């Protein structure tokens, strides 16, 4: 019997009762996964405890601010925080949100959640009030952790005035790494004032471990639900494919609120007893310094990270002899970048996945260079991949269609979004990614484009619809459409085509940026180019012909007639 994913379709049971989430599994597939050892009873907390006991004095995590925890010290800090959470009434299944950059404290909070069966909800540091209020209410978070200071702002203070809009939120904690907490509880004081957890909390592998919010075509972020078994299956397959062991040192420059950072930068290392190296603000100089200092053996990130590192290495050589490989995902690897890495002796590997199915296609370390440059890998252990047409019928090798996957890593659905879940997951457990790809005879896939309407800017997903909805609130704008435009470093940037209301005849990019700033949305969602036109091209049924606008922006870029934000 070939393993398949959990049964998730229109008849999936997803309900909230007293803030608890109930998941229903297809018992036949669940049994198959358990029989093959892909799923089990153990939770992430069980794996953590096993590692912490086996190597208490080994360094578990460090960050660029000089913080460093052994497995024993990290376990103690997390246990003290978990004890406080229990005292404040947190129960198994409650959602705990934390909006932290790449700091050791992220891991402390995550592990504290695991110890008491709470559900981790990591959030992007770039989010502002609009996204935060939406997500915290959506997942009904009971606690929220944020820095007292980061990037010259006080993130924890953003949420304090909004508590009247967050009825479920009971505690706000300031992570006082860079500045003292003045208006909230402080994480350091909580850990200092509490003793280690003495009560053993049992969590089953089928219970919810995390909700990761991801942007998509529907506008506002969707909560991707992952069980302990989903995450364990994903990361064990990931580590096995890349021969990762306790001797490896993981460099993670990506945000920990992303699946990339959360799963591969924090979770995977502790499953195998490796070291995690975190960077809160990516600059190529800071990244290279950590790579050298920590003797990092592997690094994972989007193409812009590689692009920037190569530019610095041209002028400033660095000792990267310990680096076994750089794993690149999120967007296509330009041939120029791949060739430069090869010339410098950096093994650049491709990986493909999504928050919903992460990561399920990876190359082999001993694959020929052509595989690295021209494919995005093949299915990880226990995962199936197929390419389908618009009717979701399987296509033969070589044909372009939508990529679909199923396996023990595939998510359990979107949090409190049964209709979106039913569209993404069919009754046989297949997740339809919305990405276009081709598969060769050997099972290797190559992502060729997207069906879904998103812009991938340096690995960050931007919903065109969300940006359009904000643009349409501008007093000068009558109609708007947002499309992706190519960018050598980031892969894509967003370009807004707007039709103005009479009697307005002009609209500057500065005006649009100021408007988005007042709307308190994340900066990476701001339009970076703007084109004012008389009307948007539409079909006879009224649908905007975005392909014409994409062609137009390509033409405009070559002629350099588009206003660009610096």
From Swiss-Prot:
Induction: Expression independent of FadR. FadK is not expressed under aerobic growth conditions, the levels of anaerobic expression vary with the terminal electron acceptor, with more expression during growth on fumarate than on nitrate (at protein level). Disruption phenotype: Cells lacking this gene grow normally on aerobic oleate plates, but grow relatively poorly on oleate plus nitrate plates under anaerobic conditions. The double fadD fadK deletion mutant fails to grow on fatty acids under either aerobic or anaerobic conditions, although fadD mutants grow on fatty acids under anaerobic conditions. Signal peptide: none annotated. One of its GO terms (biological process) is fatty acid beta-oxidation. Its EC number is 6.2.1.-. One of its GO terms (molecular function) is medium-chain fatty acid-CoA ligase activity. Pfam families: AMP-binding, AMP-binding_C. Its main location: membrane. Keywords: ATP-binding, Cell membrane, Fatty acid metabolism, Ligase, Lipid metabolism, Magnesium, Membrane, Nucleotide-binding. One of its GO terms (cellular component) is plasma membrane. ATP binds at residues 231-242. InterPro entries: AMP-bd_C, AMP-bd_C_sf, AMP-binding_CS, AMP-dep_synth/lig_dom, ANL_N_sf. Optimum pH is 7.7-8.2. It is found in: Cell membrane. Pathway: Lipid metabolism; fatty acid beta-oxidation. Probably starts on Met-1; overexpressed protein starting at Met-19 has lower activity, forms aggregates during reaction and is unstable in storage at -80 degrees Celsius. The enzymatic mechanism is a two-step reaction that proceeds via the intermediate formation of an acyl-adenylate (acyl-AMP) intermediate. Catalyzes the esterification, concomitant with transport, of exogenous fatty acids into metabolically active CoA thioesters for subsequent degradation or incorporation into phospholipids. Is maximally active on C6:0, C8:0 and C12:0 fatty acids, while has a low activity on C14-C18 chain length fatty acids. Is involved in the anaerobic beta-oxidative degradation of fatty acids, which allows anaerobic growth of E.coli on fatty acids as a sole carbon and energy source in the presence of nitrate or fumarate as a terminal electron acceptor. Can functionally replace FadD under anaerobic conditions. Homodimer. This is Medium-chain fatty-acid--CoA ligase. It comes from Escherichia coli (strain K12). The gene is fadK.
């Amino acid at each position: 019997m070939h393993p398949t994913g959990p049964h998730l379709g229109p008849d999936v049971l997803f309900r909230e009762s007293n803030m608890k989430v109930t998941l229903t599994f297809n018992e036949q597939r669940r049994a198959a996964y358990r029989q093959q050892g892909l799923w089990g009873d153990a939770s992430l907390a069980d794996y953590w405890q096993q590692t912490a006991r086996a190597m208490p004095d080994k360094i578990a995590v460090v960050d660029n601010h000089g913080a460093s925890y052994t497995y024993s010290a990290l376990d103690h800090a997390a246990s003290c925080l978990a004890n406080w959470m229990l005292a404040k009434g947190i129960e198994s299944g409650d959602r705990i949100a934390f909006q932290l950059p790449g700091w050791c404290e992220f891991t402390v909070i995550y592990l504290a959640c695991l110890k008491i069966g709470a559900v981790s909800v990591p959030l992007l540091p770039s989010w502002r009030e609009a996204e935060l209020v939406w997500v915290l209410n959506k997942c009904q978070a009971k606690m929220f952790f944020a820095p007292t200071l980061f990037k010259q702002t006080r993130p924890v203070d953003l949420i304090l005035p909004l508590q009247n809009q967050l009825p479920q939120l009971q505690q706000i904690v300031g992570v006082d790494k860079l500045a003292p907490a003045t208006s909230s509880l402080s994480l350091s004081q909580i850990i200092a004032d509490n003793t280690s957890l003495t009560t053993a909390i049992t969590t089953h592998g089928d219970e919810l471990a995390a909700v990761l919010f991801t942007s998509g075509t529907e506008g506002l972020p969707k909560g991707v639900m992952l069980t302990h078994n989903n995450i364990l299956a994903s990361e064990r397959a990931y580590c096995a494919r890349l021969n990762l062991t306790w001797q490896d040192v993981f460099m993670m420059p990506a945000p920990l609120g992303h699946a990339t950072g959360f799963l591969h930068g924090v979770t995977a290392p502790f499953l195998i007893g490796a070291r995690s190296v975190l960077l809160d603000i990516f600059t190529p100089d800071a990244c290279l310094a950590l790579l050298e200092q920590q003797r990092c053996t592997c690094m994972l990130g989007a193409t812009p990270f590689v692009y920037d590192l190569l530019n610095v290495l041209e002028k400033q050589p660095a000792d990267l002899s310990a680096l076994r490989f750089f794993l690149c995902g999120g967007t296509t690897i330009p041939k120029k970048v791949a060739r430069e890495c090869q010339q410098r002796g950096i093994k650049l590997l491709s990986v493909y996945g999504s928050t919903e199915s992460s990561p399920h296609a990876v190359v082999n370390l001993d694959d020929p260079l052509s595989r690295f440059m021209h494919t995005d890998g093949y299915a990880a252990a226990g995962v199936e991949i197929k390419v389908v047409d618009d009717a979701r019928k399987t296509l033969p090798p070589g044909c372009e269609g939508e990529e679909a996957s199923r396996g023990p890593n595939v998510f359990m659905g979107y949090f409190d979004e049964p209709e979106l879940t039913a569209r993404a997951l069919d009754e046989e457990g297949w997740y339809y990614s919305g990405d276009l790809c081709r598969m060769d005879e050997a099972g290797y896939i190559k992502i060729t484009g997207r069906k879904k309407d998103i812009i991938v800017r340096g690995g960050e997903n931007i919903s065109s619809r969300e940006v359009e909805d904000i643009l349409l609130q501008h007093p000068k704008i009558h109609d708007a459409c947002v499309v992706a435009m190519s960018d050598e470093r980031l892969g894509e940037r967003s370009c807004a085509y707007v039709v103005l209301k009479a009697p307005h005849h002009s609209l500057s990019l500065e005006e649009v940026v100021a408007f988005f700033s007042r709307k308190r949305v994340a900066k990476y969602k701001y339009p970076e180019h703007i084109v004012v036109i008389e009307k948007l091209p539409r079909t006879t049924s009224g649908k905007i012909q975005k392909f014409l606008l994409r062609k137009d922006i390509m033409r405009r870029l070559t002629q350099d007639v588009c206003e660009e934000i610096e």
